[in-house]
From Swiss-Prot:
UniProt family annotation: Belongs to the Ycf3 family.
Name of the protein in its database record: Photosystem I assembly protein Ycf3
GO cellular component: chloroplast thylakoid membrane
Source organism per UniProt: Vitis vinifera
Membrane topology annotation: Peripheral membrane protein
SMART domains referenced in this protein's UniProt entry, alphabetically: TPR
Keywords assigned by UniProt, alphabetized: Chloroplast, Membrane, Photosynthesis, Plastid, Repeat, Thylakoid, TPR repeat
Entry-linked Pfam families: TPR_1
TPR repeats (start-end): 35-68, 72-105, 120-153
Compartment(s): Plastid, Chloroplast thylakoid membrane
InterPro entries named among the record's database cross-references: PSI_Ycf3_assembly, TPR-like_helical_dom_sf, TPR_rpt, Ycf3/AcsC/BcsC/TPR_MFPF
Function text: Essential for the assembly of the photosystem I (PSI) complex. May act as a chaperone-like factor to guide the assembly of the PSI subunits.
Length: 168
């Protein structure tokens, strides 16, 4: 049974109903419908913290999905899971891949910046200020891109850029 039929969450049920209606009325191929079903089930599993199941669904959705824009969101969600699991190198790889297909994902730039900032803080704790500065500079570049795409968002990042004199 598809995951969307067993989820008891009201919002997930509502999303599933709306998604099913859209799948019926919007002209799509069976492959696109199947890809979306896997994507939807991946999001449901991810929201419940079932990351292994979510990844399986996302990988299957990637196999079926041909639209670069839709693939970007699948890749982004895979990156989120790797971030949650502390697999930052893998997460960065998936965020990069998502941005290759859709350069207008400010949340991917933000998450990449957060990872770089975290690595900068780790370098400071290890006593390597030069490496830390390089990570912080990279974080700044990603945050600038996120802010440029969505002015008014990422206020904490914007303040950090000003405080550290990295905002131009």
């Amino acid at each position: 049974m598809p995951r969307s039929r067993i989820n008891g969450n009201f919002i997930d049920k509502t999303f599933s109903i709306v998604a099913n209606i859209l799948l019926r009325i919007i002209p799509t191929t069976s492959g696109e419908k199947e890809a979306f079903t896997y994507y939807r089930d991946g999001m449901s599993a991810q929201s419940e913290g079932n990351y292994a199941e979510a990844l399986q669904n996302y990988y299957e959705a990637m196999r079926l999905e041909i639209d670069p824009y839709d693939r970007s969101y699948i890749l982004y969600n895979i990156g989120l899971i790797h971030t949650s699991n502390g697999e930052h190198t893998k997460a960065l790889e998936y965020y990069f891949r998502a941005l290759e297909r859709n350069p207008f994902l400010p949340q991917a730039f933000n998450n990449m910046a957060v990872i770089c900032h975290y690595r900068g803080e780790q370098a400071i704790r290890q006593g390597d200020s030069e490496i830390a500065e390089a990570w912080f500079d990279q974080a700044a570049e990603y945050w600038k891109q996120a802010i440029a795409l969505t002015p008014g968002n990422y206020i904490e990042a914007h303040n950090w850029l000003k405080i550290t004199r990295r905002f131009e």
